[in-house]
Amino acid sequence: MGVQSANIFSIAPDASTDPKYADQNNGERGKVQPGNNAPMWRQVGAGVNGYSSLPASEAPEAGNLIQPFVQYPGSKLTTAGEAWRQVRNNWIIPYGGSLLLIVTLAIALFYYGKGTMKLHGAETGRKIERFTPLERAAHWTNAIAFVLLAVSGVVIAFGKYFILPIIGSALFGWLTYFLKNVHNFAGPLFAVSLIIVFFTFLKDNWPSKEDITWMLKGGGMFSGQEVPSHRFNAGEKVVFWLGVLGLGVIVVASGLVLDKLIPGLIYERGTMQIANMIHGVATVLMMAMFLGHIYMGTIGMQGAYSAMRTGYVDETWAKEHHELWYNDIKAGKIPAQRSPEAVAHGGAASTSASA
C-alpha cells in the first residue's frame, strides 16, 4: 500500500469558520484539513511535553522539544535555543575572533618596532632565585593546561572558518571530537593548578603604592626607562587579579557547568546555553590578556623565559626590571636563594639567565 498524499489547502467547506478551529488538536484538524499538522507544531512551540525523546531522567525538560521564549543580551525575543545561537554566531564568534586577531597583530607590530627588551648593563654572573621549584611546577602545569584549552577551544569555536575548508568535514569532525575530549580533561587540571598558582603567588601580588607610578608611566614600555617595582610589577599584578582570579573563576565555574561536574545542579538546556555564552566571553578575554603575558615571558624580554625555566635571574636583570625587589634582597629583607635546593647549592646555579 502506497503512501497517500493530502493537499493541506483542501479545506472542507467553511472549516475555518468554526469558532474552535484555532483550538483544534491534530486529530480534529485532520478531519477537516487532512495533512495539516499546525496544531501539533503549535504545541511543540508552546513547550508541551511529549514531542522529543528526552527521557524522564532529563526532567524537567523530559519530552520537551522547543524551549520557551527569552531575550539574551544581543539577541531578539525568540526561543532560547535560537537566542543562544544568535548571541554566539552574531557576537561571541565574530567579535571574540576579531579581538584575538587584533591583540596578536598589536603584539607582532610592537615586537617589530621594539624587538626584545635587552639588558642595559652587563650580566654579573651572580644568580638570584626568582622562582622556586614549586612555583615553577605550578606555573608550567597551569600553562600547559591553558595552552591545551586555548588551542582546542579556538579550533572548536573558529576552526570551521580556517581549518574546515582545508581538511574537509570528515577529518575536521574527527579533529574537533578529539579536541573536545582534550578540552574536557584539561579543564579540571587547569582548575586545580589555577588554585595552586593563586595561593602560591598571592603574597607578592598585593597592590602597593609604587604600582600607581608604574601604571601612570606605562611600565616604561614606550619610554625605555624602567619603572622601579617589587617582585611583580603592576602589569603582572593586573594579570594575576583580573586574569588568574577574576576571569579564572568565571572560566572554571562555567566550564564545570558545561562538564556537568557540579553536584546537585539541574543541567537544563537553558543553563548550559548561559554557561556556554559566559564561558565563551570569559575565555576570549582571558586569552587576549594572556597573549600579552606569554609575549613578555618569552620573546618580549631577555631573561624572562629563562627565569621561569631555570628559576634564576642575573643580578643585573633583577636590578633593571624589579629594582625595589633587588634592593630588598641586598638589604637582607628577602633571601636571594629562597628554596632549600638553592640554599644547599649556595645559589650557584649553572644555568644562564640571559636566554
Q: Can you say where each PLM-predicted feature lies in the sequence?
A:
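Membrane-embedded alpha-helical bundles that constitute the cytochrome b-like, heme-associated redox core
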Residues: 1-355
